[in-house]
A protein has these predicted regions:
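Gly/Ser-rich catalytic/binding loops embedded in alpha/beta enzyme cores
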Residues: 1-118
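General beta-strand structural signal in soluble alpha/beta enzymes
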Residues: 27, 69-72, 122-124, 228-229, ...
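Short, hinge-like loop/turn segments at secondary-structure boundaries
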Residues: 86-90, 138-141, 245-246, 327-329, ...
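Glycine-rich, small-residue loops and helix-cap segments
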Residues: 28, 286-386
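Acyltransferase
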Residues: 209-229, 256-261, 285, 289-306
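Short helix-loop capping/hinge segments that flank enzyme active sites or metal/cofactor-binding pockets
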Residues: 23-40, 245-291, 353-360
Length: 386
């Protein structure tokens, strides 16, 4: 199915002569485009909120750089989803694994790039919404350092975790777009040290870990100074529980006024997520906030300048479309356990394609110190060329 928002049609030419001239992009339907409704994946949000009069910062930045906007893409409702299935707008095609989910919530953006309909696409990442689709669709994808990019004109979900992100099929395009959005050139120097997160590779399914082994070996040859470490001493499942607590609480705070005022329609899983956020006890919030500080301290210790950490982006490849809810809950929980560090600690992360498990793509991720986003892009270029 099409990755674009049903019934929408737009094309806005980029500025002539910019560094991205000749490239095209799509924008997740959380980004404002002047004169077009921001739907957020929910028909009532689009109907009950005003049409924006200005472009989102990320959209304007790409247009100013010469990139041409060709459409707005489907998202999980109000970005509350990790698999990419939208009850109102459908599930965008995953061309790398037909019959399987594209990953979410930036599902349409990943699908559009993977299908070759555009060169790059904007997504958002709170609990994995760029990293997961990048892994499932076989793309380069980035979750930048939290707070590095302006989020003006982007519909929020959980502000303490929200970031803008983007996708590309090849490392060269990924680097061009990254340099523009990050506002600095990609450095020539590669990372000096590599950490292999043994707990993350152990958490992934055996076939996924095995599929990533050749890429990991190439990375070790590129960065000979490497060692193994446990990323989450408290346990990846503990970090997952903390993010699973904090994110719905903030999502409820973000959307509470709208929900109580306008009584919008939601799919069951989205409504449940919002209501769970409303019901989290104060003691649980306090515990989760403490775990966030633990995660931040651990990654700050592991990732001094010049060091990168390698881990699987997702614990397994894309699941089938339309699985029943009892099967989906453990799948979502497992994915979040490998993605929670992004929302908790805010470090930049790049997912690199190139491996397949069970015939479907899986990504290898690299993390770096906060602010070292372009170092990760350089590493992605080196891995693709190796």
């Amino acid at each position: 199915m099409s990755p674009f928002v049903p019934g929408s049609s737009l094309r806005i030419e980029g500025s002539a002569g910019g560094p991205l001239a000749g490239l095209t992009f799509a924008a997740k339907d959380l980004f404002d485009v002047a004169g077009h409704p921001t739907g957020g994946g929910n028909p009532d949000w689009a109907r009950q909120n005003p049409v924006p009069t200005r472009h989102a910062w990320a959209v304007q930045t790409l247009l100013d750089a010469g990139c041409t906007l060709i459409g707005k893409t489907i998202t999980d409702e109000v970005s509350l989803g990790i698999l990419g299935e939208n009850a109102f707008e459908g599930t965008p095609l995953n061309p790398a694994a037909p019959g399987h989910v594209p990953g979410g919530s930036s599902s349409g953006s990943a699908s559009a790039v993977a299908q070759g309909l555009c060169d790059t696409a904007l997504g958002t990442d709170t609990g994995g919404s760029v990293r997961v689709p990048a892994s499932f669709c076989g793309l380069f994808g980035i979750r930048p350092t939290h707070g590095r990019l302006h989020l003006t004109g982007m519909l929020p979900q959980a502000p303490s975790s929200d970031t803008t992100g983007w996708f590309a099929r090849d490392a060269a395009t990924f680097a061009r777009v990254s340099s523009v959005l990050l506002g600095e050139p990609i450095p020539e120097a590669r990372p000096a040290k590599l950490i292999v997160a043994t707990d993350a590779f152990g958490f992934a399914e055996a076939e996924t870990a095995a599929a990533l082994a050749p890429a990991l070996e190439r990375l070790k040859r590129l960065i000979p100074d490497w060692r193994e470490e446990v990323m989450a001493p408290q346990g990846l499942s503990v970090w997952g529980r903390a993010q699973r607590t904090l994110q719905p609480v903030e999502a409820w705070e973000t959307f509470r006024t709208w929900v109580e005022r306008d009584n919008p329609r939601f799919a069951f899983s989205v409504a449940r997520g919002l209501l769970l956020g409303a019901a989290v006890p104060e003691v649980e919030r306090g515990w989760a906030a403490l775990m966030r500080q633990e995660a931040r301290g651990r990654l700050r210790h592991l990732l001094p300048p010049g060091t990168v950490l390698a881990m699987p982006t997702t614990p397994f490849p894309a699941p089938k479309i339309g699985l029943p809810l009892p099967m989906l809950n453990p799948i979502r929980d497992a994915i979040l356990c490998l993605c929670a560090h992004g929302g908790l600690a805010g470090h930049p992360q790049v997912s690199i394609p190139g491996a397949r498990a069970e015939g479907r793509p899986v990504g290898l991720s690299l993390l770096a110190a906060r602010g070292a986003d372009t170092l990760l892009v350089r590493a992605a270029l080196a891995v693709e060329a190796a």
